[in-house]
């Protein structure tokens, strides 16, 4: 598989080889959809980790599109095949490595695996995600869902002859689970190491800092799951995140007494997702549906349409929300829109830090655009915004 990837990359090796100054740089082939011409345009994207600068070349016309320019919003961790990155308001999809050096350095050991938080540990999702981020994983997909008995049987097919099979099925269907696709070098092995032994009691002895030691109870109620092999990882990820474009198991949105929260891309890329989920839970808000989305600009413009011509930061808000993955949450609470908006605090984090220092934006926000979270402003829009993500976009 890896040899095939490197071979495929060689056909797209750029004519722009390593720069004369010999500074390290990584090359990718990226595509951008030009809405005006209705065309997919292909570029070579160069990233220089020494100073965080980027350079772009038009592949078809063989000319420089963007001279080498420092760009602080792109990190080396963002650069992997299939990811969407935002470079000066253009959303680029990374489709291949641009040269064999980049393929060898960044692609040789990258793996994806399934991380599944089981029903007994969903309330500790923030802590588990925090451990995942600190262990060098990138979360590329995330979805809270419920499993039918048929889906549970497909998931546990390898345990069908085990005496505890029925207990497994009953437990995994007893409440919501959170499925994630996670990425890093040697992901399968490293995720199993972070999980600890399958029996939580043994984990507390042999791996006291592991997820199962901290959050599990026994061999079935053991907080989280990870596949053992490449084959099982591929099979299980196909169950939860079908490559055919289907939704997989049903999401958990209730569409009652709800409002919408969106954790913005900058907060995700800065590793704040787990901390924000913990803060929301500790403030006694119910999180009845959670899902990661990669939005295109048209989706964001539609979602933010009410702010167009009203908020001076509208264009920057749109650019931020489509700059990378975001996480949408259905918040449930009595009078949810008002109480959650107050918990988020003023839109400007500087004002929030002076007036409401305990709010989400005061703690996690940076600027009025990169203010960590979006929340519904008007009570009549709470359900509509939740439906936009968990009914329209999810389907």
UniProtKB/Swiss-Prot annotation:
InterPro entries: DM10_dom (IPR006602), NDK-like_dom (IPR034907), NDK-like_dom_sf (IPR036850), NDPK7 (IPR011410), NDPk7A (IPR035525), NDPk7B (IPR037993), Nucleoside_diP_kinase (IPR001564). SMART domains: DM10, NDK. Its EC number is 3.1.-.-, 2.7.-.-. Its main location: cytoplasm. GO terms for biological process: brain development; cellular response to leukemia inhibitory factor; CTP biosynthetic process; determination of left/right symmetry; epithelial cilium movement involved in extracellular fluid movement; flagellated sperm motility; GTP biosynthetic process; intraciliary transport. GO terms for molecular function: 3'-5' exonuclease activity; ATP binding; metal ion binding; nucleoside diphosphate kinase activity; protein kinase activity. Residues 22-110 form the DM10 domain. Pfam families: NDK, PH_NDK7_N. Keywords: Cell projection, Cilium, Cytoplasm, Cytoskeleton, Flagellum, Hydrolase, Kinase, Magnesium, Metal-binding, Nucleus, Transferase. It is found in: Cytoplasm, Cytoskeleton, Microtubule organizing center, Centrosome; Nucleus; Cytoplasm; Cytoplasm, Cytoskeleton, Spindle. Disruption phenotype: Nme7-deficient mice show situs inversus, hydrocephalus and excessive nasal exudates, phenotypes suggestive of primary ciliary dyskinesia. PANTHER family: NUCLEOSIDE DIPHOSPHATE KINASE 7. Belongs to the NDK family. Component of sperm flagellar doublet microtubules. Component of the gamma-tubulin ring complex. Possesses an intrinsic kinase activity. Displays 3'-5' exonuclease activity with a preference for single-stranded DNA. Does not seem to have nucleoside diphosphate kinase activity. Functional component of the gamma-tubulin ring complex, implicated in the regulation of the microtubule-nucleating activity of the gamma-tubulin ring complex in centrosomes, in a kinase activity-dependent manner. Part of the dynein-decorated doublet microtubules (DMTs) in cilia axoneme, which is required for motile cilia beating. This is Nucleoside diphosphate kinase homolog 7. It comes from Mus musculus. The gene is Nme7.
């Amino acid at each position: 598989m890896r040899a095939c990837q490197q071979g495929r990359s060689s056909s797209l090796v750029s004519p722009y080889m390593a720069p004369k100054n010999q500074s390290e740089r990584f090359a990718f082939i990226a595509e951008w959809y030009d809405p005006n011409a209705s065309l997919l345009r292909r570029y070579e994207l160069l990233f220089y980790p020494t100073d965080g600068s980027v350079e772009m070349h038009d592949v078809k016309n063989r000319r420089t599109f963007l001279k080498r320019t420092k760009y602080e919003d792109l990190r080396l961790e963002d650069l992997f095949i299939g990811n969407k990155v935002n470079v000066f308001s253009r959303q680029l999809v990374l489709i291949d490595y641009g040269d064999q050096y980049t393929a060898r350095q960044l692609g040789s050991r990258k793996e994806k695996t399934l991380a599944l938080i089981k029903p007994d540990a969903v309330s500790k999702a923030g802590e588990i995600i925090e451990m995942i981020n600190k262990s060098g994983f990138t979360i590329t997909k995330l979805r809270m869902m419920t499993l039918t008995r048929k889906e549970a049987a497909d998931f546990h097919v390898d345990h069908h002859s085990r005496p505890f099979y029925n207990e497994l099925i009953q437990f995994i269907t007893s409440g919501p689970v959170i499925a994630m696709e996670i990425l890093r070098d040697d992901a399968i092995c490293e995720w199993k190491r972070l999980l600890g032994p399958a029996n939580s009691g043994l984990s507390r002895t042999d791996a006291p800092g592991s997820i199962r030691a901290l959050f599990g109870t026994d061999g079935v109620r053991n907080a989280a799951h990870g596949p053992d092999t490449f084959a099982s990882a591929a099979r299980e990820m196909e169950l939860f995140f079908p490559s055919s474009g289907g939704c997989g198991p049903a999401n958990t949105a209730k569409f009652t007494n709800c409002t919408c929260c969106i954790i913005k891309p900058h907060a995700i890329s800065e590793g704040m997702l787990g901390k924000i989920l913990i803060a929301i839970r500790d403030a006694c808000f119910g999180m009845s549906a959670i899902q990661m989305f990669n939005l295109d600009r048209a989706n964001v413009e539609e979602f933010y349409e009410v702010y167009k011509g009203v908020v001076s930061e509208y264009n920057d808000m749109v650019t931020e929300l489509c700059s990378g993955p975001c996480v949408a949450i259905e918040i449930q609470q009595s009078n949810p829109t008002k109480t959650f908006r107050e918990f988020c605090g003023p839109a400007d984090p500087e004002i929030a830090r002076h007036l409401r220092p305990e709010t989400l934006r005061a703690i996690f926000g940076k600027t009025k655009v990169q203010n960590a979270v979006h929340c519904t402003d008007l009570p009549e829009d709470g359900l509509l915004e939740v439906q936009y993500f968990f009914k329209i976009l999810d389907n």
